[in-house]
Regions:
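Long, contiguous binding/interaction regions
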Residues: 2-41, 47, 54-88
Length: 88
């Protein structure tokens, strides 16, 4: 089963890479972009038996830095997000 994990910086955490992209877009003449935040996409291919809780644990222990990042998990058509990377 394919699982996508989206990792993004928490609100309030400075995003220098996003700021650099925003500045570059303006320099290239693109207008109307108010902000840019950069994150990462991690794709996993897991057995169907792998529980949601186990994937969340992978995120908390390795895939996301829980101090500064949030994560959101999508399993083939399902989306489960935890804004602070915490169980709902």
């Amino acid at each position: 089963m394919k699982v996508s994990v989206y990792v993004t910086l928490k609100n309030g955490v400075l995003d220098p890479q996003g700021k650099a992209i925003h500045h570059a877009l303006e320099g290239l003449g693109f207008r109307g972009v108010n902000d840019v935040r950069v994150g990462k996409l991690i794709e996993l291919d897991v057995d169907e038996a792998v529980a949601q809780a186990e994937i969340e644990e992978m995120c908390r222990k390795l895939l996301a830095n829980m101090v500064i990042e949030n994560f959101r998990i999508e399993r083939q058509g399902q989306t489960t997000g935890h804004p602070a990377g915490q169980p709902a």
